[in-house]
Amino acid sequence: MSGRDLELTLDRVSSIEYPALVKEAFLNNWHASAHRSEVTSNCASLNDRYCWVLSRNQIFIWERAKSSHRAIIPTQLPLPTSGLPRSVKCVVVYDGVHRGANKTPCPGILVVSPEGVLRHWTSIESQTYIEEVLDINNEVALRVELTDEPIDGKSASFLLTTTSGTVYFLNGKGQDSAKTGALECNKVAGREAHGFRRRLSSIMFGGESKESTSLITNSFQHQSKDLLVVTVSPDVLTVYNMYTPCELWSLKTKEFFQPKIASFFEADLKRTPLKVRARLIDAAVFRDGLMILIGGTHEESQSVHMFMVWMSANWQTEQPTGVVWSARVPMNEHRALFSKIDDSIYSNLTLCIPKNTAESKKADRTDGIIIINPYFAVSLYLPFDLAKPKKPESLYRHVSIPPRDQLLGYAICSQYVYIMMLESGVSTIRLLPRGFADSSIYTHEQVVVPSLSVGTDDWPILSELLSEMVASGLPKTPLYQSLHRAFELFAEKHMAESEEELKAIIKMPDQEIARIVSQFLYAIIDYSDAANKTDTELHAKRVLTSRIMLFLKHMGVYERIISSPLGISRGGILSLRVGGTMLGEVSERVAASTAIWTWKTSNETNSAVFDAIIEKVLRIPEVQDLGLKDKDALFGRCGLVHHIPVVAAQQLEKNVIGKTKSHRFEVFHAVCELLSGIKETIISWRNCRTKVAIPKFPIWWTLETFASCYRDVAEKIIEELKNGSSTDSERARLLMYILSIYDFYLSESDSQPDNDKVLQEMIALGKPADAMELAEKHKDFGTLVKNYLTTDVGTRQKTFERYKKMFEKDDFEMYLCDYLKEHGRNDVLLQQGGSRVDAYLDNFKELRYSREIANKQFGKAALTLMSLADAETKSFSKFVEFLTRAYYCACSSIDGTDVSEVLDFYKRRYPEMKHRKRIPTEILKICFGNDLDAMMSVEDMLEWNMAVQPNDEASVEGFARAFHLLADLLAVHPDSDELKKKIDKTWKALVDYDEWNRVRSKEDVEKKTIFGKFCNYLINSYPADKGDSFPIWMPISRRLIFPTDIDTVLDECIANTTGNHLSWIKGHLKWIGEQLCKQALLPKSAFFRPDMKQVGSISQAALEAFGPILQRREQRFIDQLNRDSMMET
């Protein structure tokens, strides 16, 4: 049979069917998103034994072989949470070491989320897994592949590739990793990252930079002599050798492939094409070579053109030097998908070559090279030797995916390429004889399940059920019959007849209408018949209650009853409420009952806990009066559903839950899942766009019935977490339950929380962000203020200002003032602005200076602050604040107040403040321990600066700080004899610091003594503060520290100095004094030294260029001074 007689078909695999749970998951994904499916085109796959489907946060896996005597029950496994789209490329299903009931290996599953969270099941029968957070350097996981099967007690090993091109090796961790599934992650190879700074520098200064590479779109491993990993990105094709490990070779698209693509365009245009651009799409091994799919564009075409190139088997050992074979892939169908302006075509094409096809030297009995797109599939049939193409004509075939169907995923197996579709199931892509495939299977319609539908076709069934509800729960009076008929006519879209039927009721008072509607609705939600399925009955109640709300709204009844007084029974006690409370309660009771039923049927543990709960609920007097015996019959009584969460919370009491840890956590999880499910269902029902919006009244039914049990459960979870008996995974899970459960309690509560205890406990347990989110949502101002007081000033003040606007109606501003004053945070209180804060602060005398500043009475504020600074003897930070503010206020005073005393005080105390700040933290810790804010006197600062230091450099800097302090003080008090004595005492300490008996020469004095090094510091070292370009200590000030009588100082020294030592010291000081005199004559500009670290790259370059100029300028001044001194002599 010639190739022309072949056609590409989708051959249905009847032996593979989707289980009911998987179909339900598909339906849930559809209905959950308002007529938009959440099912992606990369969520399903299969292998020779199993199929699997990703659905939201779970994965379904089942055997391919269909059983004739029992239904297919898939295994459901939870997936790690992810904020990025999932892909089956990151799922590996393999044969594990465990044996099932039929003695066949149970599959193991490895799942990695895009963020790098790994879950590993060594056997799906155990339902236990290992979870690891892989260190993949904040990259996104792209693909995971199995490298080695589990053997000899070692776990299976895998290769993980990220979108950045990094390859990680996942291998077993521990001696028994085959059973535990523990894995460890090690980086094997990857592309070199090119930082932003290098590229920016290259742009600004013209340096050469490597061509940036784009994200990896696909990768795969190939086992030959070595284990190779091929990564494909639009710009680069890279091959890594895992055994080395290293990069084997890399080919850039622009340099290697683009010229070949340009030759095709040149042949078509008969001239050189312009703006040719090629992008790699995918690659696969074919006949030992490498087949590559490439997309190309040029200026004169608005479409993306497809090409295939093949490189010989040499690619496995060395970098290819050229393309062996290449061809254009015609894409004549679906041309709109290949528009040049839409780049999605590059990511939606996948190259699929089954193993047998890839290894076959001939194309006979193969299906060719398959290219898959969500809308079509293409086969390229190559019946010739690619290395020696005698007949280079290839066969191209195309098949479309059914228009009403959706691609779920694909699988490349040994023989075929499988595709999994939403409606049509599983098919293979086959090149079959023309007419062989029967396409009639694609024309069938989905069967509508009446119990689960909400359309017009289900109304006859719902109408029949409604009649049973009304007949069993209401008296046969004309009013109820009229309401029933009116609603029936409304549901059948006979609006005029419905309004006519309702006239008698419309004439009644609003309160009476509310009573009739209430009884009608309660007759619906409290109906129960053992002959009906519970889920079908609950769904019918939900549909009917929703439609009744629309009915009431459309007929003008809703507005009349929503505010009407209405008596509602609560445990046999009649409470006066309004019609709106009743309408919301009815709908939410049905939603809560549905949530409880879903929870009960989800797993066996929940069912067992439910039985224990129901046994206690049935003993409640209100329930006993109904004579219910069947446990499931309680679901038909939605009016009693509030007892279930209350009794469920009681199951967590210590005398009930039991002492076994495993059983205790099972009950904890079951109860928390129940409460979370009720909460989520009620909240989602309130937010449903299709229902009539009912305002929530202050006293809601949930608060009166069961909301308090949510707080009880949250407190029990916190108590359990404090015990410390839970594992990390259990702890994380319980914390997530608290967020959901306590959020519902706060939303239902009628009082505003303040510094809520549970929220504070959540912060202490490591969930500050979530706790703050709840506090902000529910207006717990105490928790908000307490938490943000621990943040930096900028963040704190911006947040407070935002809260003032957000909670303006709740008077957050005054709450903040009261809180700050009560907790002694006057510093933060003074940062607040506004007229209301000003009025508040006027009531407190201790904050007088702040008011004086606010009122621009700067002179008075300066005197107040000066007295505070003078009285401060404990806190240095407060002293600095008071002193600085006093000076600024004095400088800003324009009210005529005499502030000379303040300025003189600042002048006298400023040196103390300045030099106290320069003392290193290490010295302060030695002095005061952790109290780094302690005040220090001048004597203390001198003593600790001159203390023994760990090295000579630190000692010199310490003496420099001491002398600098004395110099600044002497500049303020030039006639102070006491300061001069302290200078002499400091010189004496400097000389006594060294062991002079080891000094043998004058050079030793300069190089080996602290005295000599300090003298050298005086003339050669001019450090500046960070960000300043001038020294902190100028030569003219350094001259002030010279002793008045050096002979007296040396005579009082206790150091073991000889006559030579004394002469060397005197000579050295004389020479230093001369040098400082010369330097003092230099202008200030001669000491200009810019801080290179505080300027940008361009400024730095400019300043570095001016550096030699400044140095020559300084040297010119020095030479001039030397010449002048020589002339004088």
From Swiss-Prot:
Lineage: Eukaryota, Metazoa, Ecdysozoa, Nematoda, Chromadorea
Cellular component, GO, one term: nuclear membrane
Similarity-based family: Belongs to the nucleoporin Nup133 family.
Protein name: Nuclear pore complex protein 15
PANTHER family: NUCLEAR PORE COMPLEX PROTEIN NUP133 (PTHR13405:SF11)
Protein's organism: Caenorhabditis elegans
InterPro entries in UniProt: Nucleoporin_Nup133/Nup155_N (IPR014908), Nup133-like (IPR037624), WD40/YVTN_repeat-like_dom_sf (IPR015943)
Keyword rRNA-binding recorded: no
Subcellular location: Nucleus envelope; Nucleus, Nuclear pore complex
Transmembrane parts of this sequence: none
Molecular function per GO: structural constituent of nuclear pore
Role according to the record: Important for early nematode development.
Top-level lineage group: Eukaryota
